[in-house]
Amino acid sequence: MPKFFLRRVELSLEKPRVERHLAAILAADVAGYSRLMGADEVGTLARLRTHRGELLDPAIEIHRGHIANTAGDSILAEFGSVVDAVSCAVEIQRSMLERNSETPPDQRIEFRIGINLGDVVSEGTDIFGDGVNVAARLESLADRGGICISRQVLDQVEGKLDVTYRELGRQNLKNIAKPAEVFAIHLDAAASPGSRFLATANLKQEIRYCKAPDGVRLAYATVGS
């Protein structure tokens, strides 16, 4: 048998090469999707298409991400920058608050978002791996209209974005071997009613002056909300 033929057979038996890389993964899902579909299937699908076409898909593209997978009410997106991923999520959730302001509560489309930084496996445009699985589990922990992130994400964005965070502690995530430190991004000045966790205080520092009995002018700082 010719040697070149043997070589071709050997190559065909080799396992396909796995492409791995580090990425910021954003997983988004519609809260209460089954209920919304049961109440108004046509209207729900139309509203979801509108939100995606006018907000979600453009926001992901503007923040240099790409959509890896979609399935009904869920979106999986990948970013090369953690800051871009979190900025995108914050823009989406803040914009959805405005979009839902005049929509009846029982018709509102509200997203939960989870973001993780981890190693992923690429297959075409789709991504897989524990990094993706953790992002999906973080999404399930988020409040309606909320964002949950992992410790790895917080370490990359802390001090770089104009948002505060709530520590949710170590959480056992389904089918994930180790507990994960989870944080919720605080999107507005006060915790929303029904929030499962206490919001981090938004503290301000102010310099004030006073005069001592001997006439010396003193400066002091006040810290508070």
Protein language model features and the residues they cover:
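Catalytic NTP-binding/metal-coordinating core of nucleotidyl cyclase/transferase enzymes
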Residues: 3-4, 8-95
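Intrinsically disordered or compositionally simple regulatory linkers and C-terminal tails
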Residues: 1-20, 185-207
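A short loop-to-beta-strand scaffold at the N-terminal edge of the catalytic core in hydrolase folds
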Residues: 213-223
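Short hydrophobic/aromatic beta-strand or adjacent loop that forms the aromatic wall/cage
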Residues: 179-182, 205, 217
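Catalytic beta-strand-to-alpha-helix segment of the class III nucleotidyl cyclase homology domain
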Residues: 76-187
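Residues that act as N-cap/strand-start positions at coil-to-secondary-structure junctions
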Residues: 62, 202-204, 214
